[in-house]
Amino acid sequence: GEQARAALSRVIAQDAPIVLLDEPTASLDIAHQELVLGLAGSLARAGGAVVIVLHDLDAAATHADHVVMLVDGQVAAAGTPAEVMTSEILSRVYGHPIDVIDHPVTGRRLVVPSRSRRD
């Protein structure tokens, strides 16, 4: 986690117009994940281009302006999170049922794998 935060700090200090981040939140707790993704959003709103590789579909649905889903190195879907992050598309891409629901209070899109408890 500390290495990821230090690397992100170096990227910000360089004031690069394009930022490429590969799984920047993978080793972070939830609070730091939100901090990093919020910071990336701030960089984008300030005019920078930010490309982030994420496997956390819920975080991508929340923070991304545009999503590109790859399967075997080929683009399987591209568009806004609302266009791309649907149960149908995600389930096809991942080969596993995925639920996409709207939060009952905030309306924010929630992406979770369908799971059944095995007793």
Describe the predicted segments one by one.
Residues A60-T62:
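A short, surface-exposed alpha-helical micro-motif characterized by mixed small hydrophobic
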Residues L54-H55:
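H-loop/switch region of ABC-family ATPase nucleotide-binding domains
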Residues D29:
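ABC-family nucleotide-binding domains
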Residues V93-D119:
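ABC ATPase nucleotide-binding domains
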Residues Q33-A46:
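Helical segment within the ABC ATPase nucleotide-binding domain
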Residues V19-E23:
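Catalytic Walker B motif of ABC-type/P-loop ATPase nucleotide-binding domains
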